[in-house]
Amino acid sequence: MGLMNAFDSQTEDSSPVIGRNLRSRPLARKKLSEMVEEELEQMIRRREFGEGEQLPSERELMAFFNVGRPSVREALAALKRKGLVQINNGERARVSRPSADTIIGELSGMAKDFLSHPGGIAHFEQLRLFFESSLVRYAAEHATDEQIDLLAKALEINSQSLDNNAAFIRSDVDFHRVLAEIPGNPIFMAIHVALLDWLIAARPTVADQALHEHNNVSYQQHIAIVDAIRRHDPDEADRALQSHLNSVSATWHAFGQTTNKKK
């Protein structure tokens, strides 16, 4: 039996099985809004509509795609989530370009859900430790005098906020933001801001006095980080950063345990 004959034989023998499998697995039909979304996305990516240019009106899109208003609106909402259009009340959708913030925004819901699972906070804290460890080493090796001055200014605001918990949290976030800005990578910034937002939102409510003590410890650890960066010592900067974040993690874990016992 030749090769082609053998192939033909296998095809004939297996066709009833394939037919049964296909009948048991119906093809998924796309919604009209999904088809409109895909077509508009391709048009935007082909530069048929330039950045900042308005798309046709809803009525024109309805006529062009021969669909109803709900399908057009769903498609535009999906494109907005992707960062491909901006939608303002009373105006036609305008083409935009997705940013790092758009990417992080898409992940935000999943991240918050993950944080609510057992061990979720610990996993995100480990991610933050790995991420900021790289940032602080880079800062110690490459930070300019101007960037170190910005860190010092953030540290000064830190010190002025020790007795005001809300202000200290803002200055704490700002200190780490200045650190994340040093490489000049907008994706790093978006990841860093999102990580802190997610972690802070997951933290328990704590009495003011306990937070005052925590603020003072964090401030002293920030000083150690800046001193190491100023000396351009990446190993010492990394040790100071890891000591700081491990301390923060342990403190908030203890706060959480105390809060749970009171419930």
UniProtKB/Swiss-Prot annotation:
InterPro entries: GntR_C, TF_FadR/GntR_C, Tscrpt_reg_HTH_GntR, Tscrpt_reg_NanR, WH-like_DNA-bd_sf, WH_DNA-bd_sf. Residues 58-77 bind DNA. Keywords: DNA-binding, Repressor, Transcription, Transcription regulation. Residues 1-21 are annotated as: Disordered. Transmembrane segments: none annotated. GO terms for biological process: negative regulation of DNA-templated transcription. It comes from the Bacteria. Residues 30-98 form the HTH gntR-type domain. One of its GO terms (molecular function) is DNA-binding transcription factor activity. Transcriptional repressor that controls expression of the genes required for the catabolism of sialic acids. PANTHER family: HTH-TYPE TRANSCRIPTIONAL REPRESSOR NANR, TRANSCRIPTIONAL REGULATOR, GNTR FAMILY. Belongs to the NanR family. This is HTH-type transcriptional repressor NanR. It comes from Escherichia coli O7:K1 (strain IAI39 / ExPEC).
